[in-house]
Amino acid sequence: MQVEITGSAVDQDTIITVADLKAHLRVTHTAEDTLISALRSAAISWVEEHCNIKLGSYTARGYLPGFYNSYIPIGPVTAITEVKYQTTEDKTYANLSTLLATNWFSDEITQPARIAFRDYPQVYEYALMPVVVSFTAGHTTMPAPVLQAIRLLVAHMYENRQEEVIGTITTRLKFGLEALLNPFRIIYQP
């Protein structure tokens, strides 16, 4: 399944505020607020990519090559709202038919979430991705370990603004991040 985020970007202050990060960094001035905000964006993106999750609530669409039972590769999925399909040549996905909710089943409890189909109609045979699954995904309440991982990443990037630090003992940040984030990772194998 190919996924496209369709909703507007989440306000990152709903995930973690710059004030929270400044308190963690023990920064009391405002001169570096822009830098800390940029580091926050990078840290949130890294956590989302590493865990295959979304922080904040997003609306999205998943595209399938047919009515195949499928996993949804990002999460946590909070609801699958509708399934539409292509019956004619339409490269803009503007004129899709809606599949009745009785013809598909979803499981949003397990992660990755799944969708299964039954009694489905014929789709346009020359369409590459004729089935469109609309859903919402994302953590609306941020888990404490995820917030701590974001704080660690921001602190690491704030203190180490270059790729390599010479003359210091090597320390491993990744283990701490893995310990915090592994319970939230969604492993998707197509």
Predicted regions and their residues:
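Divalent metal-cofactor coordination and adjacent catalytic microenvironments
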Residues: 1-190
